[in-house]
């Protein structure tokens, strides 16, 4: 197949992706309540701090709440076809359990989506993205409590009804599998002494699966032409050697993630997970009708983030020297790493796309991919981020190869098209954007926006539908 025959499909959703809690700021404006992000000053992998006495960059983000028109104009200049963001749950239901929504919060997203549509940019909306109401954590125990399903369903129905003529593409939970890696952020979980943590995490996941299925049902009822997806933090795992034990370990590691898309895309708990739960004394409490609900209301597409691949080993020496990758695994000696230790593997994206499509035969959407790096503003005011261009180009070329393989890929929204507060480290120094934001790790700066070299590069990629790659 010649390179001319390898192309992105017409109508491909090019764009960028953010999360409300990482960009909006205005954490206590507009009737908004406190979320888990508001008490996580050091990022999703660190202990939460309810005292709120230390610096938390999420509180002001990049001031997108007040500057979204300026930012959307820049996205439009790049030619975005789509922009993925989340609705801050606590702007709509400040404590999470209110009967009636907060009108001021609803109005903000009306204005935001109107601005996107004015510029012919399709909103892609995540209903819950690492910003669960703190009230649901403190008063109900987070997603451990089945009662939270009811609150989530009310919230989902509220936003579906409000934005039914503005938003077609939805996702129910961001990186739903992260509940196993960052349980407070992913599930609002605070463990008691002696509690079976694994049981609590998988019980929370089950409640999220049920909530997701109810959201799919409601979304299809309220917005008949809507497309409602799941979203996982995806990766591919290589065996460190051809030793059968390493190959099996790699398969098991991938299944820990694929379980979450299996349930939402296929509509049932797979056999391998039933065995895992039984062997680890994990008892999932299911209500009558749960299994039927999961079966009947599967997602329309699979959204996923991809930043890195992983390697698996059963060698104690390899395990002892592992580290760096956010989701674990051992170091792959054939790959380079980012400044934060995330191993860079464009070919792994093609493998991931093929794995997911072989498994589900549902449309796929890369909703996060990017390079977190330190950017330097030169004396002439420019930012020469060739490293970012190279990273993104290499990954997009592999995505194009996957399309040629037969994968149905509907879009690509790079992570953080404008610099934002990192989820994993809660800092500004780790930058992803095509647009630089003048703010540092201490919270100082003008918040001014500056186009990086990658801005014009991505603009050209979109204008040519990827042919300039």
From Swiss-Prot:
Belongs to the glycosyl hydrolase 1 family. Keywords: Carbohydrate metabolism, Glycosidase, Hydrolase. The keyword Coiled coil does not apply. It catalyses: 6-phospho-beta-D-glucosyl-(1->4)-D-glucose + H2O = D-glucose 6-phosphate + D-glucose. Catalyzes the hydrolysis of aryl-phospho-beta-D-glucosides such as 4-methylumbelliferyl-phospho-beta-D-glucopyranoside (MUG-P), phosphoarbutin and phosphosalicin. Plays a major role in the utilization of arbutin or salicin as the sole carbon source. BglA and BglH are the major proteins contributing to hydrolysis of MUG-P by extracts of late-exponential-phase or stationary-phase B.subtilis cells. NCBIfam families: PRK09589.1 (NF007154), PRK09593.1 (NF007158), PRK09852.1 (NF007356). This is Aryl-phospho-beta-D-glucosidase BglH. The active site is at 175 (proton donor), 368 (nucleophile). One of its GO terms (biological process) is carbohydrate catabolic process. It is an enzyme of class 3 (hydrolase). Induction: Highly up-regulated by aryl-beta-D-glucosides such as salicin or 4-methylumbelliferyl-beta-D-glucopyranoside (MUG). Gene3D superfamilies: Glycosidases (3.20.20.80). Pfam families: Glyco_hydro_1. The lineage of its organism: Bacteria, Bacillati, Bacillota, Bacilli, Bacillales. GO terms for molecular function: 6-phospho-beta-glucosidase activity; beta-glucosidase activity. GO terms for cellular component: cytosol. Its EC number is 3.2.1.86. It comes from Bacillus subtilis (strain 168).
């Amino acid at each position: 197949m010649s390179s001319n025959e390898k192309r992105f499909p017409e109508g491909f959703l090019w764009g960028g992706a953010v999360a409300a809690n990482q960009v909006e700021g205005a954490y206590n404006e507009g009737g908004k309540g406190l979320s888990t992000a508001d008490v996580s000053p050091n990022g999703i992998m660190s202990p939460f701090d309810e005292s709120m006495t230390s610096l938390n960059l999420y509180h002001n983000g990049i001031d997108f709440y007040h500057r979204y028109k300026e930012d959307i104009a820049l996205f439009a200049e790049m030619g975005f076809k789509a922009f993925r963001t989340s609705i801050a749950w606590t702007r709509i239901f400040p404590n999470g359990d209110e009967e009636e929504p907060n009108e001021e919060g609803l109005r903000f997203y009306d204005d935001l989506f109107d601005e996107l549509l004015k510029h012919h940019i399709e909103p892609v909306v995540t209903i819950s993205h690492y910003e669960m109401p703190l009230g649901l954590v403190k008063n109900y125990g987070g997603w451990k409590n089945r009662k939270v399903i009811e609150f989530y369903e009310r919230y989902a129905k509220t936003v579906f009804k409000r934005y039914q003529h503005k938003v077609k593409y939805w996702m129910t939970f961001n990186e739903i599998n992260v509940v196993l890696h960052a349980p407070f952020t992913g599930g609002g979980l605070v463990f008691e002494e002696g509690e079976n943590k694994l049981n609590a995490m998988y019980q929370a996941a089950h409640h999220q699966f049920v909530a997701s299925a109810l959201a799919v049902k409601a979304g299809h009822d309220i917005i008949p032409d809507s497309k409602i997806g799941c979203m996982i933090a995806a990766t591919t795992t290589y065996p460190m050697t051809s030793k059968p034990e390493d190959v099996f370990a790699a398969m098991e590691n991938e299944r820990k993630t694929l379980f979450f898309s299996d349930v939402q895309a296929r509509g049932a708990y797979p056999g391998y997970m039933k065995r895992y739960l039984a062997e680890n004394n994990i008892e999932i409490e299911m209500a009558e009708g749960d299994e039927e609900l999961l079966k009947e209301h599967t997602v329309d597409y699979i959204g996923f983030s991809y930043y890195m691949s992983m390697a698996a080993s059963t060698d104690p020496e390899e395990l002892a020297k592992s580290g760096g990758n956010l989701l674990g695994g051992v170091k792959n000696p054939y790959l380079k790493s980012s400044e934060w230790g995330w191993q860079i593997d464009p070919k792994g994206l093609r493998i991931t796309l093929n794995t997911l499509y072989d498994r589900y035969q549902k449309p796929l959407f890369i909703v996060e991919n990017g390079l977190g790096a330190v950017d330097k503003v030169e004396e002439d005011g420019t930012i020469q981020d060739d490293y970012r261009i190279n990273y993104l180009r290499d990954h997009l070329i592999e995505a194009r190869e996957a399309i040629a393989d037969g994968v149905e890929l509907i879009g690509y929204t790079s992570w953080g098209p404008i610099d934002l507060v990192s989820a994993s480290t809660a800092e500004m120094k780790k930058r992803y954007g095509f647009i630089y934001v003048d703010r540092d790790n201490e919270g100082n700066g003008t918040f001014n926006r500056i186009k990086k070299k990658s801005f014009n590069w991505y603009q050209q990629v979109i204008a040519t539908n990827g042919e300039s790659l």
